[in-house]
Amino acid sequence: MAPRTIVKVDLNKPAWEQPNLHNRWHPDIPFAESIDEGETVKIECLDWTGGQIKNDDSAEDIKNVDLTRIHYLSGPFEIKGAEPGDVLVVEIQDVQPLENQPWGYSGIFAKENGGGFLDEHYPKAAKAVFDFEGIFCSSRHIPGVRFPGLIHPGIIGTAPSKEILAEWNRREGALVAENPHSTHVMAQLPNASYAFAGILADEKLSATVASEGARTIPGRPENGGNCDIKNLSRGSKVFLPVHVPGAKLSIGDLHFSQGDGEISFCGAIEMAGSITIKCKILKNGISDLAMKSPMYLPGPVEPHFSPSRYLTFEGFSVDESGKQHYLCTTTAYRQTCLRVIEYFRRFGYNDYQLYLLLSCAPIQGHVAGIVDIPNSCTTIGVPMDIFEFDVSPNGKAKIIDLGSCAFANS
């Protein structure tokens, strides 16, 4: 028997006019639907921008994206029988793009509007559109590359209790207050602009959620959320703590593929799609599992590349100016990314194409060493078989015409 579809989305309608969606974490957002323990259900989701990005050859939409109108999640769902202190086990049975939108996109935000991990080096907005062909994808904006997707939800989480929500706002607010002169946005605090508690919320509740609801941008230890873990694919199980009656599970931000780190921020292959799940409740699971943050079991369905076919680059806690940092994995990983870009630039790609590819292709990022002072060492393995030409390290590269990603017109 086909699973019950509990959320359907309309790609031609604004997200805030559709039922069963919301874009804040708050314990009082009304249930969208109820799910029985052990019931298999299908849930449709908008892409993470709510339809702001188009299938075209300009990055104007990426440059001008409204980051207050994002993460319209499907939910929250009541899981019947779930109570605070339990653990909710969500089995991801399938994830697919919507049949009427067989494409996705990866983007680089402009430094002044969101930025990304390498925005000091690559401040301009850029975009690549990917077409889906069964399990494979390819892009006219990054020619010479084709790979299978590891399709997954970027966001899956439960609602916080009122106490946990207050703690989030306290600690994230303190971080912002402690860094008044930072050149980076330290945290996204509650923001009433385009806050959406769902069409079932009355005016008073909508105002409450707008003023105190947590933004969905970061993942958090108490509920999971936007962790962007590429291995939460078909067949995986994610274990989430329950803090409110019914759990109030929400899901969204579906990805066709993503590299470890999702470094460009809008960096997976973002898509509208559907996810099929089944839930199990572990009573008293938070205590029994000594759980302080979510955990997961990967599924058996992943693209397989021979270990010997990953061309692997190293980076250390020494930045591009030669400054030594102490065991800084952020510096090391940024340097690893730059080493990858420098290598593949030799074949004819521009740096923005490679920045996008690093973010959305099935690369493997690892912390190799974190004890050998003063340097951390991180690695990035790039599967050479995603390329349609030889990229192995055999001397001087042959430069070929590899086109360009999309840029903004202004």
Swiss-Prot record:
This is Putative formamidase C869.04. InterPro entries: FmdA_AmdA, FormamaseFmdA. SUPFAM superfamilies: Acetamidase/Formamidase-like (SSF141130). Keywords: Cytoplasm, Hydrolase, Nucleus. The keyword Protease does not apply. Belongs to the acetamidase/formamidase family. Its main location: cytoplasm. Hydrolyzes formamide with the production of ammonia which can be used as a source of nitrogen for growth. May also act on acetamide, propanamide and butanamide. Its EC number is 3.5.1.49. One of its GO terms (molecular function) is formamidase activity. It is found in: Cytoplasm; Nucleus. It is an enzyme of class 3 (hydrolase). It holds the Pfam family FmdA_AmdA. GO terms for cellular component: cytosol; nucleus. Coiled coil: none annotated. Homotrimer. The keyword Nucleus applies. Gene3D superfamilies: Acetamidase/Formamidase-like domains. It catalyses: formamide + H2O = formate + NH4(+).
